[in-house]
Amino acid sequence: MSASKILVGCWLGLAVLSVSTVLLGNAGATLALAAGVLLAAFGKAWLITDGFMELRHAPPAWRLLLLGWPLLMAIGVLLTLL
C-alpha cells in the first residue's frame, strides 16, 4: 500500500474518531461514555503515532513510550471518575 493511501486512511480514521468523541461527549455523563471518549482518544493517539509519525517500523521502546503515555493518562482519568 502506498504511503499516500495510508495517510488518507489515517486521516479518515481520525475524522471518524473525532466525530465519535463529540457525539459520545454530548450523549451524557456516565462512566461508560467517558470510557468510550477515552478509548477514542487512545485510538487517535495510536493512529497519529503509527500512521502520521510512521513509528510502526520504529524500535519497540519508542512505540511503548509514545503509546504508553496516553494509555496511562486515560487510566488516570478513569480512576479519578470512580
From Swiss-Prot:
| Predominant cellular place of this UniProt entry's protein | membrane
Query: Membrane topology for this entry?
Result: Multi-pass membrane protein
Protein localization:
Cell membrane
Any Pfam family the entry gives: COX4_pro
Q: Does the keyword Cell membrane apply?
A: yes
Q: Which GO terms describe its cellular component?
A: plasma membrane
The protein's superkingdom reads Bacteria
Instruction: Alphabetically list the UniProt keywords.
Output: Cell membrane, Membrane, Transmembrane, Transmembrane helix
Q: Where are the transmembrane segments?
A: 1-21, 22-42, 62-82
Q: What is this protein called?
A: Uncharacterized 8.5 kDa protein in nirQ 3'region
Origin organism of this chain?
Stutzerimonas stutzeri
